[in-house]
Amino acid sequence: MSGTKIHPTAFVEEGAQLGENVSIGPFCHIGPQAVIGDGCCLMSHVVIMGNTILGANSKIFPHAILGGDPQNNKHKGGHTSLFIGKNCIIREGVTMHRGSDTCAGKTVIGDNCQFFSYAHVAHDCHVGHHVTFANNAMIGGHVTVGDYVIIGGGSAVHQFVRIGHHAFIGGVSALVGDLIPYGMAVGVQAKLAGLNIIGMKRAGLERKEIRSLRHAVSMLFDHSKPLRERVYDVFSFYSTSQSVVDIVNFIQEKGKRFYCTPRFENDTMCSNKD
């Protein structure tokens, strides 16, 4: 624990593991199963509960509570965990829960993520790398979030929903269906409002690739054919485009929710069993 500083008012329980150059601020409470990586900074009134692992060089702001019991009535109190990657920024009042013993029992957060004030990550979620949750964004249990996703402020994501990489959810949206990679969803209930062009440009996609994605998505959500035929047509036409293949693979994986689709005139939803 070379270079580690613990404020006199902080309570670090016996068994907690602290790395080097860790800073524990006033009135923090670190549970006996917690593992705090090198270079982490916990400001005042931070609570780390249960089997929680915090990656190196992460910064936790006041009143964040990490590793709390899952809000799952089926949870029987088994040994479950929360893993948070390195270089994460977790702002004031954020809550993240451990996994539940009804499945794998792990909640996982990737590296280089930012969680703004009062964001919430429920039990058994898997959040990728470089993900941003704006203020008051929340996701239900068992949600999967791909890399480089942005979830706007005040937005809510239904349990078991999958969000593909580089997707964007507008503020104060309610996402109840799976959102394809690069997709942009807005509204209550959220609908697919095109592609996250800004995110694709940030990711370095060329104009030709973006045009291919736009055309592929328009083909996928043209309801003139069954979904399996549309997927086959898109893959046949764009098999050399990795970005399009990512979307095809996402759809073929078939999660437990339907897909987030464009707001057609008849407002139909595309079933993942189509």
Swiss-Prot record:
GO terms for cellular component: cytoplasm; membrane. Its EC number is 2.3.1.129. It is an enzyme of class 2 (transferase). Disulfide bonds: none annotated. It comes from the Bacteria. Involved in the biosynthesis of lipid A, a phosphorylated glycolipid that anchors the lipopolysaccharide to the outer membrane of the cell. This is Acyl-[acyl-carrier-protein]--UDP-N-acetylglucosamine O-acyltransferase. It comes from Bartonella bacilliformis (strain ATCC 35685 / KC583 / Herrer 020/F12,63). The gene is lpxA.
